[in-house]
Amino acid sequence: MVELSGVDESTKKKELEDIFLDNISHELRTPLNALIGLNDLLNGVAGQHMEEEDRLIMKDHIHKNADRLMTVMDDILDLSRMQKGSLTIHKTVVSLMEICCKARDAVKGQVQPGVKLQHEYPVALKDTFIYTDGKRLEQLLRNFLLNACHHTELGSITLKVKAYRDEKRGRRMLQIRVDDTGEGIPHERRSLLFKPFRKFDGQMEGLGLGLAICRQIAKLLGGVVYLNTHYVGGSSFAFEMPFEEI
């Protein structure tokens, strides 16, 4: 029975890896085709007769597809580093507000029509600087936000930041949370969320790596990620870590 279970687990892993490879093909081809098509159109005869406003819109689409392609490549490289145990962080003094704003701005083009992207940032933390890996923290928040964008068709996506004191541990804690009004996540699927290659039913975009990478980044930053969700009524992904203002 144990041996059979091992075979089943191996087969399941192989199936997930095959799906992942198919997803890579789609996630690379889609932005590449868009980049080639938009560039040809912009530099062709039609582009020469475009209004400046239309040219700017085209350039914006090119930029968004380039960003999407870069995100895919970064996720693939980070997966490789995770499997080798070589995913690292480099801490510096960074602006907390700047990190949150960069993550929010990076996903604006992915928000579906009818969804409001907003943030709640305490005035008391506006000028806060912390010692952490700003690039990795931004990546974690961006993945949280992208996940919300993929599953929220109406309502809102809200990035919330707060600081509080954990009396039990005697430390000040930073919590950054992304709340959405999407479809929510069934209880039986929640344990799989932070594992590689996992995607929700009906999810068309993404490689299924973002949340797995988030969990690893959180550990390296000395924090944790967790989920609060209702099957009907949206989800809330949060990251918490101890911090001291610089």
What spans do the regions from the language model cover?
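A conserved beta-strand-to-alpha-helix junction within the catalytic ATP-binding
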Residues: 90-105, 138
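Helix-loop junction within the histidine kinase core
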Residues: 76, 80-91
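Glycine-rich ATP-binding loops of the HATPase_c
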Residues: 222-228
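Short conserved segment of the HATPase_c
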Residues: 185-197
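Short alpha-helical Gxxx[C/S/T] motif in the catalytic ATP-binding
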Residues: 210, 214
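Short alpha-helical segment of the dimerization/phosphotransfer core of two-component systems
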Residues: 64-69
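Primarily the dimerization/phosphotransfer
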Residues: 4-44
